[in-house]
Amino acid sequence: LLCLFGHAHAFNPDLGNFRIECINRLNFSEKMVSNSAGSLEVFVSSNTEWTSEPRSKWLSVDRSGGKGDLAVRISFEENGTEKRTGIVRFTADGVNPVEIIITQSALTFTNPITIGGNIATMPDPYIVKDGDYYYTCKASGNGIAISRSMRLTVVNATTKKWSLPYEGPSKPWNIADLWAPELFHIGDRWYVYYAAGRRGQDGITGYGTQRSGVLRSKTDDPLGEWEDMGMLYTGYDYQPGIKPTAANTEYAIDLTTFELKGQRYAVWSGNGTDAVQQIRIATMSDPCTISSSMVILSTPTQSWETMDGRKINEGPAILVNEEKGKLFIVYSCNPSWTKNYRLAWLMLDMNDGDPMNPADWQKSSNYAFWRCDNTKEPVSGVNGLGHCTFTKSPDGTEDWIVYHAMRYSDGGWGQRYPFVQKFTWNADGTPDFGEGAGWGEPLLLPSGETL
């Protein structure tokens, strides 16, 4: 979007060869254009970087009597992913029109990305690329909502596809607090992994009954109908054929899945009775069934994981560096409602490592991604970030991270907004997430994404 605004100062109808100058770069700036006939301020507001024609192509207004308002119109000749050329045309009664050709050299977007055209909260954002589309999966009250978009940086309005059951004689395990759904295309079906519990029933006031469950699509269309496939076993005493219940499992949230060498695994955040949230793993016999006892991979022990005394590892996300043969579990640490929320990782050698052996996983020596602007309402900023997932640019050439950031340093759970940004890789095969993007900071569009 390019907007130009003009204000006249002692404007003389006898313009006398009044010149509108093209500058080399127009980027959130203003320009005073003047001569003996008066002056005109040209304000430029843009969400991109622009370049103009060189000085040799400056245009002048012929001497003539001008009157009335100056009209400005811009039209584009092309729409591409690398540049876009536009013509700015200035007209006024009695004055020959003036045209300026401007080339938009880089297309940009800003965070937080919009949802249905609006800036809105989206904690634990999950966006997955499948074919030409990006699918967004999010909690919507006590339901799961999904949408589809051709663009990573624009989330279309979501539609609720499934809701938690109500309380009844069977006392369902999953009637409240639907958290962090994740969407996967496995074989010819789609699956959603989510957490829920029974808070508010039977005298339960906390979140200790949170367990992980799975939904399966009835067709190969994630925007179609879904069916509940039940709770997943997240305990430490697995027996073949065991039926998962709240009694024989433990607190389990943020479950995700990956496959390595033909074996599928479930990874989640869980704890027992000591309130220490750990990253845990188990094997799966199919996308709806965990087939082993859980194994603990990570316990929060580092100072940067326990900054306010609470011990939390959660939000595991799978990231693979195929070229270097590395598989990462990128997780969040510290409380999600605080400005200390950040990312770290566990790394496995995909060639020689056993995902079920904690000794084969290497923890990052420090946190890997964080930002805190310490802004308080009404000043927007980035104050703690985490609970991520990963995807590719539309043309598949770039790696992108999706995460949420808190708007205010004391914003809590209610101020988490969706962010996306490109990341790269270090020479040793570990991810380089760089610095968290700022609130409203222009970033280049993902490669292959058009407006």
List each language-model region with its residue ranges.
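Bacterial Sec-dependent N-terminal signal peptides
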Residues: 1-26, 99, 105-113
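Solvent-exposed, low-complexity, repeat-rich "mucin-like" stalks and linkers
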Residues: 13-16, 22-52
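Intrinsic-disorder/low-complexity, polar/charged segments enriched in Ser/Thr/Lys/Arg/Asp/Glu/Gln
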Residues: 37-41, 69-73, 97-99, 326
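Short beta-strand/loop motifs in extracellular/secreted proteins, especially
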Residues: 40, 48-52, 57, 86, ...
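Surface-exposed binding patches on compact interaction domains or structured appendages
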Residues: 45-73
